[in-house]
A protein has these predicted regions:
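PLP-dependent amino-acid enzyme catalytic core
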Residues: 1-202
Length: 202
């Protein structure tokens, strides 16, 4: 779904420049995650193999997006989540048709279990970030921005696993080589920064 690219008068005055927001809350399931999930499920369906279900791990937005994409493709969806996950987000995933499996005390353990079950049962695992088709799907946001704006000086992108940053920045750098790309990572979940410092995916 194409989302609004909205000028912010308040923030533009605050920095004495022009600030725009890409309103991905308007996207299917309420976040940009639907872009990658839909692209991934679409490519699975076009692979020539008979796909009847997918597996993923998530605490919220990605799980809802995968469940939505799976429902559109009329296939089953199993999501692994850790204990103590938000009941509201769990309910949201269920509403989109996901079967919820609670495992482990954190996202790392839930993801490891999901990958284990995926491999054992030969069911495709849909990664939230470490997948070319997910990244390419997220990159459609960059293509939309290009069609909605004149050349930008800079773009600020939130970073979790890095899928949105990788996809969007790759596209925008290809059409606007001089654009400055800035990633923002939450201080209480700076896994991308730690991974970059370690030189490997943590």
């Amino acid at each position: 779904r194409r989302t609004t690219f909205s000028y912010s008068e308040f923030f533009s005055k605050l920095i004495d420049g022009e600030v725009y927001f890409k309103l991905e809350n308007q996207q299917f399931t309420g976040s940009f995650k639907a872009r990658g999930a839909l692209n991934k499920i679409l490519t699975l369906n076009e692979s020539g193999k008979s796909i009847s279900s997918v597996i993923s791990a998530s605490t919220g937005n990605h799980g809802a997006a995968v469940a939505y994409a799976a429902r559109q493709a009329k296939i089953e969806c199993n999501i692994y989540i850790p204990e103590g996950s938000s009941k509201a987000k769990m309910s949201n995933m269920k509403n989109y048709g996901a079967t919820i499996n609670i495992f482990g005390s954190d996202c790392v353990e839930a993801e490891a279990k999901a990958r284990e079950v995926s491999e054992k049962n030969q069911v495709p695992y849909v990664s939230p970030y470490n997948d070319f088709h997910i990244v390419a799907g997220q990159g459609t946001m960059g293509a939309e921005i290009k069609s909605q704006a004149n050349e930008l000086d800079a773009i600020i992108i939130s970073i979790g696993g890095g899928g949105l940053m990788a996809g969007t920045a790759s596209f925008l750098r290809s059409v606007w080589p001089n654009i400055k790309v800035i990633g923002c990572s939450p201080s209480n979940s700076a896994i991308m920064i730690h991974s970059m410092e370690a030189g490997k995916i943590l």
